[in-house]
């Protein structure tokens, strides 16, 4: 007889299913640590996520609308990790990928290392803990080789505080 205390889905694709109202009502007496459907959709869609973060005063890469500057990043609006992200060097490359990917964002290209912050938020919206990782090798959008980093902890802490003040984020979240 095993007793389940809490279920923590770790993939944003799993969360899509678990936030649906008919599934939510059957979630093992609400023992699943997960945010509501609307907030999940906000964070899962890159465009709405950047707007949400910017509204909290959190710096995000510039979304290019009118002025296209190469190189740039083309990324799918929906998704997680680095899946569907393309570095675009020329107008020809841009034309090619715009035909292949229907819903996308064009973003400024930032040179340097890629970091991700893994967070776990309590049901009341406070952050239980977070970890900064450098993404060193990617496969299928996820980091297959990463290294923990204590860089930027003060800056990350201030971002986490802004996210906590919303009271809307619950469960595992990666930024």
Language model regions located:
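Phosphate- and divalent-cation-binding pockets in alpha/beta enzyme and binding domains
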Residues: 16-18, 96, 116
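A short alpha-helix capping/helix-coil boundary motif
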Residues: 26-31, 74, 137-139
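Catalytic phosphate/metal-binding cores of nucleic-acid and nucleotide-processing enzymes, i.e., regions
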Residues: 175
């Amino acid at each position: 007889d095993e007793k389940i205390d809490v279920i923590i889905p770790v993939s944003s694709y799993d969360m899509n299913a678990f936030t649906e109202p008919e599934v939510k009502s059957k979630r093992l007496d609400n023992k699943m640590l997960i945010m509501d459907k609307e907030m999940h959709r906000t964070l899962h869609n890159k465009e709405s996520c950047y707007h949400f973060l910017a509204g909290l005063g959190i710096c995000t890469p510039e979304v290019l609308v009118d002025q296209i500057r190469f190189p740039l990043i083309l990324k799918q609006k929906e998704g997680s990790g680095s899946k569907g992200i393309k570095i675009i060097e020329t107008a020809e490359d841009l034309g090619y990928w715009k035909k292949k990917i229907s819903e996308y964002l064009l973003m400024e290209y930032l040179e340097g290392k890629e970091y991700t912050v893994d967070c776990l938020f309590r049901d009341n919206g406070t952050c239980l803990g977070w970890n900064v990782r450098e993404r060193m090798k990617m496969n299928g959008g996820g980091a297959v080789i990463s290294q923990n980093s204590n860089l930027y902890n003060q800056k990350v802490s201030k971002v986490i505080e802004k996210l906590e003040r919303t009271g809307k984020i619950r469960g595992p979240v990666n930024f």
